């Protein structure tokens, strides 16, 4: 098993990379199956030792590695399932689903759901609306499976129903005043749930753990090697990814049975190297990047990514390829990372410096890097040692 992990909205182990942060101490699911011990070596299920658990939730892969019991990990999976039942906007019967189908009427919800909606609205306000929980109608237009950009008219019509100010939450109710508008907590829920998983493990006496919920990474204590976790931040290499996507789509288009393997062999893919490796203990690492989901519009040849600007209804056009937020809570990292990309490097650096307990690593589309924010976090994670990175003060 590797000694390195990565982050991006990542996997787990001592070292990780990011569209999510991830850890090199974490094996792939297939390698984990190959490494299963024989029945005579299996420890007692309640014995505290390093254990790993992969599971699917929130429409993404989740991973936990911890010095814990099997029961501890069972509790983690159960907790995530509970939050999915509450917060999913696509699962019939969830609180968010009920709010979106209430046709403008105030809806009774779990107090925790209402509290998270209020917290999400706080980040909407703090970011001047660059983080917006009412983007669902717009996001549906940018169908990454159809690989076709929506018309200007469709975007304009969807924008009429976008605006976080249409949402209100009390202690146990939520209302969206525009019946055509919808909310989704996808931009903050995984961070919030990662924090709750952290709290659960702490309550169960777990001190050392790596938590990755679809790339929202939280690390606790030390890795199995007795030192802080290493988290690798993915290098966006935006232009190479654009070319790769173009070649892949051309290969798919000319093959009657799917991907033309011969064309893909010509891509010359190299083993991915992280843009940097952070040293982390008791910290959250959340990365948003324009390389996470994108498609080539066959009609125009343009590449569109998934980070939408609520002001224009289109993929943002800032100079940033990724933003990695280092913070004490994953809720904060999730709530800030996407907005920072839309802001662009200069504005994002100024914004993160205003936050008291967070720092950020910015990678621009041309590959240059900058760091800004809480100096103690930057020094603790060795982010200030990133080769060539500008330290914005």
Regions found by a protein language model. Give the residues of each.
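Mature catalytic core of soluble alpha/beta enzymes
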Residues: 1-393
